[in-house]
Amino acid sequence: MEGGGAPPADTVMSDAAPAPPQMGIENIPAVLSHGGRFIQYNIFGNIFEVTAKYKPPIMPIGKGAYGIVCSAHNSETNEHVAVKKIANAFDNKIDAKRTLREIKLLRHMDHENVVAIRDIVPPPQREVFNDVYIAYELMDTDLHQIIRSNQALSEEHCQYFLYQILRGLKYIHSANVLHRDLKPSNLLLNANCDLKICDFGLARVTSETDFMTEYVVTRWYRAPELLLNSSDYTAAIDVWSVGCIFMELMDRKPLFPGRDHVHQLRLLMELIGTPSEDDLGFLNENAKRYIRQLPPYRRQSFQEKFPHVHPEAIDLVEKMLTFDPRKRITVEDALAHPYLTSLHDISDEPVCMTPFSFDFEQHALTEEQMKELIYREALAFNPEYQQ
């Protein structure tokens, strides 16, 4: 980022990169396959099969419910990437749709604060296509790891992270997309303090109002309208999440660590107070009735509760953590808030030129159709692997 988006001088993080796993990279067996066009690595008993341009060494850097992530070197572009293996990607239709959605969204976007897809590995045999491998640009760590570490964070660090989240969100929202699952672990960082938003598997089009049954966003960062099952949610849901994330950065602990839906709502009302009748206007009658029967809570003073936080930061967070989404600050207005004056530069906060289309989701796709769509995305990166 040029001009207003330059990082503060002291923002390089000394130990941003987490310690690599203990398994020695030289111990990972590698075998060429399919006539030397592919290479198989055996990682913790997992077969990791990618195109032969991903030469050794390869290193496991993460593991999740979906599979395993390795850092690898693309010998053709001379770039280090993070390759995520999604094992048996088509076994569950909802998961397969998430994968397809993430691929299509990230290929549509091009922004410094949104993680980029560098490659989708084509299957060695089109007719046996079960695992999906996606290569992303490689980052050192994520905000969740930084918050939990003893890495010192200055006010300037936190301010710069907040600015970059909002800068990325401005672009995402301008593409007609809501992220819907912003949380510290979905914000990637490098040692230079560059921040990139990732994990668009739950993203939705902003004009869509049907409530999604597959909605599993992390409870702690969830806006009140989602906790109260409002189907008519807007870009304001992401702004609420940003407010929660920023306060977690400043306080080094989650702002609203609810155990369940009911506890989550209680925690946020204990801080921001019971909403007025006027602020309930966006809710359905059931939700209004539920709120009215709760014990009343008086709003706490943010400044007294968080005396170590800059007053201008408190003012911005209070505008983000506003119960009524119609009154919540927008991303554009948050970027222009006095707290971010030193970083804000409207000429360097681009928008997406073409809105993203979720048209592919309008049809009930079969497993085979989803395979074909992801296969085509892989061929866009690797046309020479057309079968």
Curated annotation (Swiss-Prot):
Role: May play a role in the mitogenic induction of symbiotic root nodules on Alfalfa by Rhizobium signal molecules.
Organism: Medicago sativa
Xref: SMART domains: S_TKc
Active site per the UniProt annotation: 181 (proton acceptor)
Mechanisms controlling activity: Activated by tyrosine and threonine phosphorylation.
Name the record gives this protein: Mitogen-activated protein kinase homolog MMK1
Database matches in Pfam families: Pkinase
Kinase keyword on record: yes
Residue intervals of the Protein kinase domain: 55-340
Gene3D superfamilies linked to this entry: Phosphorylase Kinase, domain 1, Transferase(Phosphotransferase) domain 1
Similarity annotation: Belongs to the protein kinase superfamily. CMGC Ser/Thr protein kinase family. MAP kinase subfamily.
